[in-house]
Regions:
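Residues forming the flavin
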Residues: 1-522
Length: 522
C-alpha cells in the first residue's frame, strides 16, 4: 500500500526574535510581503549592537543615519507588532503552527504619552553604570538608551528604582507633565500562534578579564574595542573624543591588540571576522582626531575579506597606521608615568621587543549571547561546539535551523559583520515566507505508528527523540505517546528504544524486512 502524503494548514504570521539589524531586516522583509510579524526585543529599544556604534566600515557611514530609518519603519509598519522589554519563555508545536509564550516586562512608562522630554531623568536621584557605554558613564534609574531610541519613550529600571525597590521617591511621577509614569503596569504573558520563527538574537562582546596578562580591569588605560567605539560616538561617554580614561586627555601613542578571545585555544578557536576591520576603522578615527598620534596594530593575520575591505586596509597604512605582525605577551604599567609597557614578538624581524603606550585597545571578538542556551532549549535548536546556534546544513541550508520552520539570522548563528548579517536576515525571511505564502505544507509520511493498546506511557521515546516530535498525552484512562508528524524525521530512534514494541515504522516493518531476507536467500 503506498504511503499517503498529508498536508497541514499554516498560521500566516511570523515571530522574529531580536531587534538588532538582522531582526529588523527580517521583520521588514516578511511584513513587506503582506504577513503579520511579531518582533520581540529583550531591551527597551530596537537597534542591537549596531545601535552602539558611531561609524561602520569600510564606508565610514554614520551608523545611526542608516539604522534609525529602518527602526522607524518597523515602528510605523502596519503589519509589525513591536514587543520591547519582552522575551520568549515557551514554545511548542511545529512548522506552520508554533505556539509561543512571550513575557513582556513593564516599562512603567506609557509609550503613547511619553514625549521623551527627559525631565524625569534630570530629577531622578539614582545613578547606575550605563551598560550602553560599557560602564564608562552612568545613567539614571529612568532612562532612554539613545536619543534615536525606538520606541522613543523612557523606561524605568525596576532593579534600581527607589520606589519599586523600597517604596520611596516617585519624583519622576511628580515632575512628568505628560502624566506618562505608570507604576501600576504589570508583567504580561502574551500567547501567539505563528507559522515561522526567525532567530536573530545577536552576540555579546568577549570579556577579556580572564586574560590577566593584558591587565583589563586593573589598568585604566586598557580598554576594549567596543569601549573605544562608544568613545567615538558623539552621544557616547566622551562626546566623540578619544581620551585616556586615566587622564581625560587625548592619547599620543595607541596600541591595538588583535584576536583577543578569538583564534585562541584557551577561549575561542574561531575568527570573529570583524575585529581587524573595526580596529582599522578606529585607528583612522584616531588619526583624524590627532594626525600626530602614533597608532600601532599588533596582529596575527589581517583578514580583510569583504567588499572594499582590502582597500580600507591599504588606506590605513597610507594614513600612517603601523602594523606589527606578532603577539603581545604581556602588559605592565609604569608606576611613575602610568604608561603601559607592552612586551611583544615581531615575527617578521624574529625578535622580542618592548614599547610604551598611552592607550591599549583590546580587539575583542564575538561570543554567543548569554541567553543563547536558553533560546536553544526553548526552541529545540542544537548549538555547535562554539556555542552558536547550529544550522541544518552548513552548505545547503545555512539559514535553516534543524527544526523545520525556524530560521537563523545574523551573529546568532556565527560571527558576522553588518553586510553579512543583513544578507542572511533577508535569506532567513525568504525561507520563512515559503510556508506562509503556500498556506499549507506537505508532511512526508515518515513518522512511526504508535500502537496505543501496547504503549505503556513510559516516556522513553519522548526523552530520546532528537527532534522533540513525541509527547505523552492522556487518552481516556491511559497515558500514551503521540507523534507530531511535522516535527518527525523518521530517524527510528523511538522504534528501536520502545520496550513494548508499540512504536512501529511505516516503512521497513519486521514483516517487510523478513520478506526481503527470505527473497534474497532463495
Amino acid at each position: 500500500m503506498p504511503l499517503e502524503t498529508k498536508s497541514v494548514e499554516v498560521s500566516r504570521s511570523a515571530l522574529v526574535i531580536g531587534g538588532g539589524i538582522a531582526g529588523i531586516q527580517a521583520a521588514l522583509d516578511i511584513a513587506d510581503n503582506g504577513y503579520q510579524v511579531y518582533l520581540v526585543e529583550k531591551g527597551p529599544s530596537l537597534g542591537g549592537r549596531m545601535g552602539q556604534w558611531s561609524k561602520v566600515f569600510p564606508t565610514m557611514d554614520c551608523a545611526a543615519c542608516i539604522l534609525t530609518p529602518k527602526m522607524v519603519s518597523v515602528a510605523r509598519h502596519p503589519r509589525i507588532k513591536l514587543l520591547t522589554n519582552s522575551e520568549l519563555i515557551e514554545a511548542s508545536g511545529s512548522l506552520g503552527n508554533f505556539k509561543v509564550r512571550i513575557r513582556k516586562r513593564p516599562r512603567y512608562v506609557d509609550e503613547e504619552k511619553c514625549t521623551a522630554c527627559g525631565l524625569c531623568a534630570q530629577k531622578c536621584p539614582v545613578r547606575v553604570p550605563n551598560e550602553i557605554d560599557f560602564g564608562m558613564s552612568s545613567r539614571k534609574a529612568i532612562y532612554i538608551t539613545s536619543p534615536n531610541a525606538v520606541p522613543l519613550a523612557y523606561s524605568i529600571d525596576g532593579e534600581n528604582c527607589l520606589y519599586l525597590k523600597r517604596g520611596i521617591c516617585r519624583v519622576c511621577e511628580r515632575v512628568c507633565e505628560a502624566k506618562a509614569i505608570n507604576f501600576n503596569q504589570k508583567e504580561e504573558i502574551i500567547e501567539l500562534k505563528v507559522g515561522s520563527i526567525v532567530v536573530a538574537i545577536g552576540y555579546d562582546p568577549f570579556d577579556p578579564t580572564p586574560l590577566e596578562e593584558y591587565g583589563f580591569g586593573r589598568y585604566k588605560d586598557v580598554v576594549t574595542g567596543p569601549m573605544l567605539e562608544r568613545m567615538t560616538d558623539p552621544m557616547g561617554p566622551t562626546g566623540g573624543a578619544i581620551l585616556r580614561p586615566s587622564t581625560g586627555k587625548p592619547p599620543r601613542k595607541v596600541a591595538f591588540i588583535q584576536c583577543v578571545g578569538s583564534r585562541d585555544a584557551r577561549f575561542n578557536i574561531y575568527c570573529s571576522r570583524v575585529c581587524c576591520m573595526y580596529a582599522i576603522k578606529d585607528s583612522l578615527i584616531i588619526k583624524e582626531q590627532n594626525p600626530e598620534a602614533e597608532v600601532y596594530i599588533f596582529y596575527m593575520d589581517i583578514r580583510a575579506f569583504g567588499k572594499g575591505y582590502e582597500e580600507f586596509y591599504l588606506r590605513s597604512q597610507e594614513a600612517g597606521v603601523r602594523f606589527i605582525r606578532g603577539k603581545v605577551s604581556s602588559i605592565r604599567e609604569d608606576p611613575k608615568t602610568k604608561e603601559l609597557i607592552l612586551r611583544y614578538e615581531d615575527t617578521l624581524l624574529g625578535t622580542a621587543l618592548e614599547d610604551s603606550f598611552d592607550l591599549v585597545v583590546l580587539s575583542v571578538g564575538q561570543v554567543p549571547r548569554a541567553d543563547t542556551e536558553t533560546i536553544s532549549k526553548i526552541l529545540g535548536i542544537p548549538r555547535s561546539t562554539d556555542g552558536f546556534l547550529m544550522e541544518a546544513h552548513p552548505k545547503l541550508r545555512p539559514n535553516d535551523a534543524v527544526v523545520d520552520g525556524i530560521y537563523l539570522a545574523g551573529s546568532a548563528q556565527y560571527p558576522k559583520d553588518i553586510p553579512d548579517a543583513v544578507a542572511q536576515a533577508s535569506g532567513a525571511a525568504a525561507r520563512a515566507l515559503i510556508p506562509l505564502s503556500m498556506g499549507r505544507v506537505e508532511v512526508e509520511p515518515l513518522s512511526p505508528i504508535i500502537d496505543e493498546d501496547r504503549c505503556g506511557g513510559c516516556g522513553v521515546c519522548v526523552k530520546l527523540c532528537p527532534y522533540r516530535a513525541l509527547e505523552l498525552k492522556r487518552k481516556g484512562e491511559k497515558t500514551v505517546a503521540e507523534v507530531d508528524e511535522v516535527l518527525c524525521k523518521g530517524c527510528g530512534t523511538c522504534v528501536a528504544a520502545c520496550p513494548s514494541g508499540a512504536a512501529k515504522p511505516r516503512m521497513f516493518t519486521e514483516e517487510q524486512i523478513l520478506s526481503m531476507i527470505s527473497s534474497a536467500a532463495r
